[in-house]
Every structure is written in structure tokens, then in C-alpha cells.
């Protein structure tokens, strides 16, 4: 069983960037049906898995790494049914699908963040990282990877939210067990659909400690990863 679960150690993994891989409908954008049409070609290369860059529903502020719905496919790439077909057809050719997964942040258009901005008492408010403050005076001098402050002012709340990337990518609050359970349930949902694995983008940032200006490899990082593995990946193959 251990050997089966560690197939990835010796696997040949081929990354597919969907926008530019294969366009099936002539709109100039690669899509899932295009990938399906090339599976036989990919099989001839001798690959064991496809690492699929983000295809989730997204405003595309950061090439799909700003996810507004983890359980839907962006229309530019097709539909959820197309994704299910890709998983099934790849499986027939002994090719696993590894999905890019972003758990450090979501899009600001995700329903969680839309709700979070409605008030400090909203149950989704604590899904994100907030600090009280004054306009023009961020909590500290942390900077975004994309430049400028990592804090964005929300006047109706009198608070700043943390974004280590684009202002449209608010950081998720992994200290909140309810948030973690939502993410684990979502991962299991994809695993139930037959996804073979995940490539976790910037996973080292999930345990950030903004008050200490620690952005990566925070104190609880290994705790979170062990918990996530126990609740998700350990249940698959």
C-alpha cells in the first residue's frame, strides 16, 4: 500500500498551462477539451501524470491563482463536466491529473471574502487576516510580492486585510479551524472526482505570522501540513 501511495516519487510529470496548450473551439484560448484531444499524444511521451495549472473559476487577476470558486471551472476553460471527462479519459490512459491548488489566499471575489467584508461579526470575517488600524497607517511595513503594502484598508470596517500578493488576493486565516475544514472538504471533493494529487502553490506561506512580520515557514506550518495530510491526502492513493 505504501508503494502504491508513493507513485509520484518516480513519476514523469508533464505540466500543462491550459491557456496556451490547445484551443478546441477557436477562441484563441486553450481549454480542457483541447487537453483531452491531446491525451494520446501525451501518452506517447511516456508521462505518468499531468500537472494542470489553475482552471478554477477566477477573475484572472493573477493567471488563475486568484480563485473565486474552488469547486467550479472557469468558463474560458470549459465546464465541470469537461473536467470530469478529462480526469476519466486521462485515467483510461493511466495518466493521473495533479491540480494546482492555492490555499494561502483566495480571490477577493470569492463568496467568503464578499461575506467577510460585510461586518466583523460575519461568520466568514475570520476566514481572512484582519487588523484594526487607521487609514493611511498600515499595521506594519510588510510588503506585497507584487509591490506596495501588503495591507489594504477597508473603510466600512475600519480594518486592513493582509494580501501577500495582489490586492485582489486576500490571505486566508489558517488559524481558523472552520476555514481549514472548508479547505479539507474541498480537497476531498476533488479527490472523490478522481484527481490524483495536488501541487500546493506557496504552501509555505499558510502559517504566516503578520504581527511578527513572518511571511513563510511560520511556527505552525508543519502542524497544518500534517493535519491537512491526515484529513485529505492520506485517504487517497
Predicted regions and their residues:
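Acidic/aromatic-lined carbohydrate-recognition and catalytic surfaces
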Residues: 2-184, 192, 203-237
Amino acid at each position: 500500500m505504501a508503494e502504491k501511495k508513493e507513485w509520484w516519487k518516480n513519476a514523469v510529470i508533464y505540466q500543462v498551462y491550459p491557456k496556451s496548450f490547445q484551443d478546441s473551439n477557436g477562441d484563441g484560448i486553450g481549454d480542457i477539451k483541447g487537453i483531452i484531444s491531446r491525451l494520446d499524444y501525451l501518452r506517447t511521451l511516456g508521462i505518468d501524470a499531468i500537472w494542470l495549472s489553475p482552471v478554477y473559476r477566477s477573475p484572472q487577476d493573477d493567471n488563475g491563482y486568484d480563485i473565486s470558486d474552488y469547486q467550479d471551472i472557469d468558463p474560458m476553460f470549459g465546464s465541470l463536466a469537461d473536467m470530469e471527462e478529462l480526469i476519466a479519459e486521462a485515467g483510461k490512459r493511466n495518466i493521473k491529473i495533479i491540480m494546482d491548488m492555492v490555499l494561502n489566499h483566495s480571490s477577493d471575489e470569492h463568496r467568503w471574502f464578499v461575506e467577510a467584508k460585510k461586518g466583523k461579526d460575519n461568520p466568514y470575517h475570520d476566514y481572512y487576516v484582519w487588523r484594526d488600524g487607521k487609514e493611511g497607517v498600515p499595521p506594519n511595513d510588510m510588503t506585497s510580492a507584487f509591490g506596495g503594502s501588503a495591507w489594504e484598508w477597508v473603510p466600512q470596517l475600519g480594518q486592513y486585510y493582509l494580501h501577500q500578493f495582489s490586492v485582489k488576493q486576500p490571505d486566508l486565516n489558517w488559524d481558523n479551524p472552520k476555514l481549514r475544514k472548508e479547505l479539507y472538504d474541498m480537497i476531498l471533493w476533488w479527490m472523490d472526482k478522481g484527481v490524483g494529487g495536488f501541487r500546493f502553490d506557496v504552501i509555505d506561506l499558510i502559517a504566516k505570522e503578520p504581527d511578527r512580520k513572518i511571511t513563510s515557514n511560520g511556527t505552525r506550518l508543519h502542524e497544518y501540513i500534517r493535519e491537512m495530510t491526515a484529513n485529505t491526502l492520506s485517504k487517497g492513493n
